[in-house]
Protein backbone atom coordinates (compact mmCIF):
# COMPACT_ATOMS: atom_id res chain seq x y z
CA UNK A 1 0.00 0.00 0.00
CA UNK A 2 1.31 3.45 -0.86
CA UNK A 3 2.63 5.47 2.08
CA UNK A 4 0.29 8.39 1.36
CA UNK A 5 -2.74 6.07 1.68
CA UNK A 6 -1.41 4.50 4.89
CA UNK A 7 -0.79 7.89 6.50
CA UNK A 8 -4.20 9.16 5.40
CA UNK A 9 -5.93 6.12 6.89
CA UNK A 10 -3.99 6.50 10.14
CA UNK A 11 -5.06 10.15 10.44
CA UNK A 12 -8.67 9.04 9.95
CA UNK A 13 -8.26 6.30 12.55
CA UNK A 14 -7.08 8.92 15.05
CA UNK A 15 -10.15 11.05 14.33
CA UNK A 16 -12.46 8.05 14.74
CA UNK A 17 -10.60 7.03 17.91
CA UNK A 18 -11.34 10.46 19.36
CA UNK A 19 -15.01 10.06 18.50
CA UNK A 20 -15.19 6.58 20.03
CA UNK A 21 -13.43 7.88 23.15
CA UNK A 22 -16.03 10.65 23.46
CA UNK A 23 -19.00 8.33 22.85
CA UNK A 24 -17.78 5.92 25.53
CA UNK A 25 -17.44 8.82 27.97
CA UNK A 26 -21.10 9.83 27.50
CA UNK A 27 -22.52 6.29 27.63
CA UNK A 28 -23.27 6.49 31.39
CA UNK A 29 -26.02 8.97 30.44
CA UNK A 30 -28.06 5.98 29.26
CA UNK A 31 -28.12 4.67 32.83
CA UNK A 32 -29.03 8.03 34.31
CA UNK A 33 -25.59 8.87 35.68
CA UNK A 34 -24.21 12.39 35.64
CA UNK A 35 -21.16 12.95 33.47
CA UNK A 36 -20.99 16.71 33.90
CA UNK A 37 -17.52 18.18 34.29
CA UNK A 38 -17.60 21.14 36.60
CA UNK A 39 -15.26 23.83 35.30
CA UNK A 40 -14.32 26.56 37.74
CA UNK A 41 -15.63 29.29 35.44
CA UNK A 42 -17.18 29.82 32.02
CA UNK A 43 -13.86 30.74 30.41
CA UNK A 44 -12.39 27.41 31.53
CA UNK A 45 -15.37 25.59 29.99
CA UNK A 46 -14.91 27.36 26.64
CA UNK A 47 -11.18 26.69 26.77
CA UNK A 48 -11.79 22.97 27.34
CA UNK A 49 -14.21 22.86 24.40
CA UNK A 50 -11.78 24.70 22.10
CA UNK A 51 -8.90 22.42 23.13
CA UNK A 52 -11.02 19.32 22.51
CA UNK A 53 -12.06 20.57 19.08
CA UNK A 54 -8.43 21.23 18.13
CA UNK A 55 -7.23 17.92 19.54
CA UNK A 56 -9.89 15.68 18.01
CA UNK A 57 -10.56 17.43 14.69
CA UNK A 58 -8.30 20.33 13.69
CA UNK A 59 -4.89 18.65 14.19
CA UNK A 60 -5.87 15.42 12.40
CA UNK A 61 -7.67 17.44 9.72
CA UNK A 62 -4.57 19.50 9.02
CA UNK A 63 -2.51 16.32 8.97
CA UNK A 64 -4.94 14.84 6.48
CA UNK A 65 -4.67 17.92 4.24
CA UNK A 66 -0.87 17.84 4.41
CA UNK A 67 -0.92 14.17 3.49
CA UNK A 68 -3.32 14.35 0.58
CA UNK A 69 -2.82 17.73 -1.06
CA UNK A 70 0.58 19.14 -0.13
CA UNK A 71 3.65 18.15 -2.11
CA UNK A 72 6.35 20.40 -0.67
CA UNK A 73 8.99 19.32 1.83
CA UNK A 74 7.75 21.79 4.46
CA UNK A 75 4.33 20.12 4.36
CA UNK A 76 5.92 16.76 5.15
CA UNK A 77 7.74 18.39 8.07
CA UNK A 78 4.51 20.05 9.24
CA UNK A 79 2.79 16.66 9.01
CA UNK A 80 5.52 15.18 11.23
CA UNK A 81 5.14 18.03 13.73
CA UNK A 82 1.36 17.53 13.84
CA UNK A 83 1.81 13.78 14.34
CA UNK A 84 4.31 14.53 17.12
CA UNK A 85 1.91 16.91 18.87
CA UNK A 86 -0.84 14.30 18.62
CA UNK A 87 1.53 11.67 20.02
CA UNK A 88 2.41 13.95 22.93
CA UNK A 89 -1.26 14.58 23.67
CA UNK A 90 -2.17 10.90 23.22
CA UNK A 91 0.61 10.03 25.67
CA UNK A 92 -0.36 12.51 28.36
CA UNK A 93 -4.13 12.13 28.10
CA UNK A 94 -4.30 8.44 29.12
CA UNK A 95 -1.88 9.06 31.98
CA UNK A 96 -4.23 11.71 33.35
CA UNK A 97 -7.51 10.04 32.37
CA UNK A 98 -7.12 6.29 32.88
CA UNK A 99 -6.94 6.08 36.69
CA UNK A 100 -10.56 7.21 37.02
CA UNK A 101 -11.82 6.20 33.58
CA UNK A 102 -14.39 3.67 32.53
CA UNK A 103 -13.06 0.18 31.83
CA UNK A 104 -13.69 0.59 28.09
CA UNK A 105 -11.24 3.50 27.98
CA UNK A 106 -8.49 1.09 29.04
CA UNK A 107 -8.90 -0.56 25.63
CA UNK A 108 -9.57 2.52 23.50
CA UNK A 109 -6.85 4.92 24.63
CA UNK A 110 -3.89 2.50 24.36
CA UNK A 111 -5.07 1.44 20.90
CA UNK A 112 -5.32 5.08 19.77
CA UNK A 113 -1.82 5.61 21.19
CA UNK A 114 -0.54 2.60 19.20
CA UNK A 115 -2.03 3.94 15.96
CA UNK A 116 -0.45 7.33 16.72
CA UNK A 117 2.98 5.70 17.15
CA UNK A 118 2.56 3.92 13.81
CA UNK A 119 1.52 7.22 12.21
CA UNK A 120 4.59 8.95 13.62
CA UNK A 121 6.88 6.25 12.23
CA UNK A 122 5.28 6.46 8.77
CA UNK A 123 5.44 10.26 8.66
CA UNK A 124 9.08 10.36 9.78
CA UNK A 125 9.97 7.76 7.13
CA UNK A 126 8.27 9.93 4.50
CA UNK A 127 10.23 12.99 5.66
CA UNK A 128 13.54 11.14 5.52
CA UNK A 129 12.94 9.78 2.03
CA UNK A 130 11.78 13.16 0.73
CA UNK A 131 9.35 11.25 -1.43
CA UNK A 132 6.84 13.12 -3.53
CA UNK A 133 3.16 12.36 -3.54
CA UNK A 134 1.15 11.35 -6.56
CA UNK A 135 -0.40 14.83 -6.72
CA UNK A 136 3.07 16.21 -7.54
CA UNK A 137 3.58 14.01 -10.57
CA UNK A 138 0.98 15.80 -12.68
PLM regions with names:
Residues 55-58, 73-94, 114-115:
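Hydrophobic alpha-helical membrane segments
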Residues 113-138:
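Membrane-water interface at the C-terminal end of transmembrane alpha helices
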Residues 8, 12, 50, 54, ...:
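Hydrophobic alpha-helical segments of membrane proteins, primarily the transmembrane helices
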Residues 64-67, 90-93, 119, 123:
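Structural signal for membrane-spanning alpha-helices in multi-pass inner-membrane proteins
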Residues 59-73:
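Transmembrane alpha-helical segments in integral membrane proteins
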Residues 1-18:
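Cytosolic juxtamembrane helix and N-cap/initiation of the first transmembrane helix
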Residues 13-58:
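Hydrophobic transmembrane helix segments
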Residues 88-108:
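Membrane-helix boundary connector in multi-pass membrane proteins
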